[in-house]
């Protein structure tokens, strides 16, 4: 079994760009940015519980990283960058810290490196369980209307929120709930020490209006790119800014 993905081929001799979407996204999420890099082969992945991978069950991060490895092998991807947003960024950091053959580097947009104490984890577990129950039992339009009122999305205007609610409501609530619980920050280890001791290139992107993740970025041993005129979902709010940062990173 492998993850559903869309592959687009570029020039030989360049590494692949493997894109991982955020919670409730899918393989289309990164394509506006990724298609600016047509010289590179691109793989747009559907994570477990999402899109074409919605039917794949998940028990924890080990399932996610194992299937990601198998998916890369199935596409014969030998050299690659992982590019992940939010949940996809956390998956990228987890997989990279566990070890991935052929990994050139990791580019994370708004991904959390992990909570640092038991109290924070317990609070996050309570919160994620409540959200998961809502995703399982309530209309997704109602759940996402509240989801996008969370402080991390404060930079969105009403039109942007309505657009995201309509888009995300096409998901399967039960499989979203399973993925939310399986990959909760409550069960993710704190990756700061591993990232400091890494052997791969590591870059971090965050929107200039995303104060929470700008503060987190300052804690990491990463080259940070601040995306102007953007909040938490920088590649959606300012795709040109993210394209410019990726182009700068990939030139090195």
Curated annotation (Swiss-Prot):
GO MF assignments: 2-succinyl-6-hydroxy-2,4-cyclohexadiene-1-carboxylate synthase activity
Keyword Cytoplasm: no
GO BP, sorted A to Z: menaquinone biosynthetic process
Keyword annotations of the record: Lyase, Menaquinone biosynthesis
Keyword Lyase: yes
Functional pathway: Quinol/quinone metabolism; 1,4-dihydroxy-2-naphthoate biosynthesis; 1,4-dihydroxy-2-naphthoate from chorismate: step 3/7; Quinol/quinone metabolism; menaquinone biosynthesis
EC number, UniProt record: 4.2.99.20
Catalytic activity annotation: 5-enolpyruvoyl-6-hydroxy-2-succinyl-cyclohex-3-ene-1-carboxylate = (1R,6R)-6-hydroxy-2-succinyl-cyclohexa-2,4-diene-1-carboxylate + pyruvate
Record NCBIfam families: menH_SHCHC, PRK11126.1
Family under the similarity heading: Belongs to the AB hydrolase superfamily. MenH family.
Assembly: Monomer.
Function: Catalyzes a proton abstraction reaction that results in 2,5-elimination of pyruvate from 2-succinyl-5-enolpyruvyl-6-hydroxy-3-cyclohexene-1-carboxylate (SEPHCHC) and the formation of 2-succinyl-6-hydroxy-2,4-cyclohexadiene-1-carboxylate (SHCHC).
UniProt-recorded name of the protein: 2-succinyl-6-hydroxy-2,4-cyclohexadiene-1-carboxylate synthase
Species of provenance: Shigella flexneri
